[in-house]
Amino acid sequence: MQTGKLIVLTGPSGVGKGTLLSCLLHRHPGLAFSVSVTTRSPRPGEVEGKSYFFVDHDQFREMIESEELLEWAEYAGNFYGTPRVPVIENIEQGRSMILEIELQGARQIQRTFPDALRIFILPPSMAELEERLWGRGQDSEEAITKRLQRATEELEAATEFDIQLVNDSIEDTLQNLDKILFHFRE
């Protein structure tokens, strides 16, 4: 049996990773998604075990210490990580996995899975990214300022990735991702 492939989707907060991921999973039912663990509070509409596994800081530290996480990172005062077992099991069973993770985690994955396809999603411009963050209506002015500062740093790392895509249109970006995934999974 052929082993599955690992695909990493990264980019600044507000660039559209979640929307793209949701559409990709709908279009590619054979693609598996790893549900991340986080210490942040659930946002409206998020479902435990589907959107994230929500844990407290002590539980997250225990997961790090017992090496239950493939990668983990801190973002905006909260921790995020990818449970190791589901990723390994799916890949061994021949299913390709997609991870939506932060830059720090993507760098960790590169060391563990050097053959992973790493895709960086870029905004059309910083002004557009700022507009998207405000449009979500879920962050304070201070939080948005921090996210934009971090986005500037993250954008500098885009060239570390195998592929960089500007998300100026969800449909155009999805078409590009479809082509990329088709060739990568062959």
From Swiss-Prot:
Catalytic activity: GMP + ATP = GDP + ADP
Main localization of the protein described in the UniProt heading: cytoplasm
Enzyme's top EC category: transferase
EC numbers for this chain: 2.7.4.8
PROSITE patterns assigned: GUANYLATE_KINASE_1, GUANYLATE_KINASE_2
GO molecular function, one term: ATP binding
TM ranges: none
Highest rank taxon of the organism: Bacteria
Keyword Kinase included in the entry's annotation: yes
Subcellular location: Cytoplasm
InterPro entries, per database record: GK/Ca_channel_bsu (IPR008145), Guanylate_kin-like_dom (IPR008144), Guanylate_kinase (IPR017665), Guanylate_kinase_CS (IPR020590), P-loop_NTPase (IPR027417)
Sorted UniProt keywords: ATP-binding, Cytoplasm, Kinase, Nucleotide-binding, Transferase
Positions of the Guanylate kinase-like domain: 4-182
UniProt key word Isomerase: no
GO cellular component, one term: cytosol
Binding site for ATP: 11-18
Entries under Gene3D superfamilies matching the protein: Guanylate Kinase phosphate binding domain, P-loop containing nucleotide triphosphate hydrolases
Family membership noted in the UniProt record: Belongs to the guanylate kinase family.
Purpose: Essential for recycling GMP and indirectly, cGMP.
HAMAP family the record matches: Guanylate_kinase
Name of the protein described by the UniProt record: Guanylate kinase
Species the sequence originates in: Trichodesmium erythraeum (strain IMS101)
